[in-house]
Amino acid sequence: MEIKKGTWIIKKGFAEMFKGGVIMDVTSAEQAKIAEEAGAVAVMALERVPADIRKEGGVARMASIAKIREIMEAVSIPVMAKVRIGHIAEAKILEELGVDFIDESEVLTPADDRFHINKHEFKVPFVCGARDLGEALRRIAEGAAMIRTKGEAGTGNVVEAVKHMRRVMEQIKQVTKMEDEELVAYGKEIGAPVELLREVKRLGRLPVVNFAAGGVATPADAALMMMLGADGVFVGSGIFKSKDPRKMAKAMVLAVTYWDNPRILLKISEDIGEPMRGLDVEELEVRMQERGW
């Protein structure tokens, strides 16, 4: 267990390097290069962006090895890739391929309706989505080195990401005021290990990096998530479904860097072209955020 714990600390440290940055979904070597040139701290290699997964339906699986390898060979920044929730074999394949990070993602069709992957068994670090503190701490207990809001991917609508980030931050604030016996009871209530709740109380935050994701479509959206306490931002469909991906990618990076400077935010929000068309979350037939437990 000590070896696993030590390895987790190293994985967690790797994720810390992404703080204050943008991680972009890409589906080709060309898109990966655009992301790198714009200043992305990493890219997420995909066959289809979430908006297309949502539109086309069917079973969404790990991207093809050829696609991921093409993207890995195109850039020098870290490359992440998604696996289905609970799909141990997909994760082992990606680890063997040499990706830098794995996202056990609700954007893909879950492979296991009872268990997430035991991430301690892998050398490669994992990022997982969460809607609240209980979900975040369950994933960390399984070995996740990084957390992100689930939001509602592929919608271009930031409302769910805002809801999830606010909920986590509010719950953390509550935890910092609790006595130990209250932490024990709260851990049972939200399904979280009390040891991790004690760590949250001590730190006043999650014990790992916490990014925003799901529905970020404009530089203003990205800045908003930073204002709410995110350590950085994942942008999925928002860049390459916009009218001018190069401009949008650069603007997203600048917005995350200068989130607390309205003058700069105004400047970078001008002349970036049309953002992706958004969807009303209330009208969705499939809510990806509800996948996972």
Swiss-Prot record:
It comes from Thermotoga maritima (strain ATCC 43589 / DSM 3109 / JCM 10099 / NBRC 100826 / MSB8). InterPro entries: Aldolase_TIM, PdxS/SNZ, PdxS/SNZ_N, RibuloseP-bd_barrel. The active site is at K82 (schiff-base intermediate with d-ribose 5-phosphate). Pfam families: SOR_SNZ. The gene is pdxS. D-ribulose 5-phosphate binds at D103. Keywords: Lyase, Pyridoxal phosphate, Schiff base. Pathway: Cofactor biosynthesis; pyridoxal 5'-phosphate biosynthesis. GO terms for biological process: amino acid metabolic process; pyridoxal phosphate biosynthetic process; pyridoxine biosynthetic process. The keyword Lyase applies. It is an enzyme of class 4 (lyase). Signal peptide: none annotated. Its EC number is 4.3.3.6. SUPFAM superfamilies: Ribulose-phoshate binding barrel (SSF51366). It comes from the Bacteria. Catalyzes the formation of pyridoxal 5'-phosphate from ribose 5-phosphate (RBP), glyceraldehyde 3-phosphate (G3P) and ammonia. The ammonia is provided by the PdxT subunit. Can also use ribulose 5-phosphate and dihydroxyacetone phosphate as substrates, resulting from enzyme-catalyzed isomerization of RBP and G3P, respectively. The keyword Repeat does not apply. Coiled coil: none annotated. D-ribose 5-phosphate binds at D25, G154, G215, G236, S237. This is Pyridoxal 5'-phosphate synthase subunit PdxS. PANTHER family: PYRIDOXAL 5'-PHOSPHATE SYNTHASE SUBUNIT SNZ1-RELATED (PTHR31829:SF0). D-glyceraldehyde 3-phosphate binds at R166. Belongs to the PdxS/SNZ family. Homohexamer and homododecamer. In the presence of PdxT, forms a dodecamer of heterodimers. GO terms for molecular function: amine-lyase activity; pyridoxal 5'-phosphate synthase (glutamine hydrolysing) activity. It catalyses: aldehydo-D-ribose 5-phosphate + D-glyceraldehyde 3-phosphate + L-glutamine = pyridoxal 5'-phosphate + L-glutamate + phosphate + 3 H2O + H(+).
